[in-house]
Regions:
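Conserved ABC ATPase "signature" region
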Residues: 126-142
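Conserved ABC ATPase signature
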Residues: 145-149, 153
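Conserved ABC transporter NBD signature motif
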Residues: 72-82, 91
Length: 269
């Protein structure tokens, strides 16, 4: 994807001047021993930051530290606002979390699930709820029970719940896990659109090809330690990925869509 220039920003509804004036999320020395060690990151509004790495690298831990769900050391700021000093309600208004596990133990309607996104605000803003359902294409599912939907439909419902809260920062933990190719694209397009509107999106993601296509910045973790950060072109190198994942890796970011995959060898008979 490379470095974003003014021409690219205009195609996303932003120009270079707008990008510099939009909020920036930064974190310094986030740690949670023994799972996370001195993580630094920075991401502008209008961008998607992808957190990548092997299983157990600390991706979900980092997201939960950013949202305040796990105790940790270090600081995080949205411009001059110290997020670690906010009350739980203030933080919930600022940041919305789309967890990896999104099953409901109650037979709620789709509309009721999406309405839960307004809890931090203490209201039932019908416009925000309707806009979230429209953005995810679930308007016709409003009266349906969440437990009777397909996996792809449920994924869009839970994403709509987060969007209904209108957070400045949307944090998603493996938003495409267990989704087929069609719904992967639907969900990722929704997240891209939300970022384009001037919000910050941070996601943990296993699919490196999707990360290369949709993310503006990447942070590569291994054993709770940052290995690299930067644009997809800077982070997704064959040598670095082979070292971190322990297998030979093939990378072609010029392909459409980008290709990032293990090099498989034929077993010896």
């Amino acid at each position: 994807m490379g470095v974003i220039d003014a021409r690219q920003l205009k195609t996303r509804g932003l120009d270079a001047q707008a990008l510099t004036s939009l909020p920036r999320l930064s974190a310094q020395n986030l740690s949670l021993d023994p799972r996370l060690h001195d993580i630094n990151l920075s991401v502008n509004a209008g961008q998607i930051l992808g957190i990548i790495g092997p299983n157990g690298a600390g991706k979900s831990t980092l997201l939960h530290c950013l949202t305040g769900l796990l105790p940790h050391t270090g600081r995080s700021h949205l411009d001059d606002t110290d997020l670690t000093a906010l009350s739980p309600r203030e933080r919930a208004r600022c940041m919305g979390l789309l967890p990896q596990q999104t099953d409901s133990v109650w037979p709620l309607s789709v509309h009721d699930v999406v309405s839960l996104g307004r809890l931090p605000w203490g209201d039932n803003d019908t416009t925000a709820i309707a806009n979230a359902m429209r953005a995810t294409g679930i308007e016709t599912l409003a009266p349906a029970r969440i437990d009777r939907l397909s996996g792809g439909e449920r994924a869009r419902v839970w994403l709509a719940r987060v969007l209904a809260g209108q957070p400045r920062i949307l944090i998603a933990d493996e938003p495409t896990a267990s989704l087929d190719l069609y719904y992967q694209q639907v969900v990722m397009d929704c997240l891209r659109t939300y970022a384009n509107a001037g919000h910050i999106v941070i996601m943990a993601i296993h699919d490196l090809a999707l990360a290369a296509h949709y993310c503006d910045q990447l942070l590569l973790l291994h054993n709770g330690v940052s290995q690299a950060s930067g644009t997809p072109a800077e982070v997704l190198t064959e040598s670095l990925l082979s070292q971190v994942f322990g297998v030979p890796v093939h990378v072609d970011l010029t392909a459409q869509p980008p290709v990032v995959s293990a090099r498989f060898h034929r077993p010896v008979a």
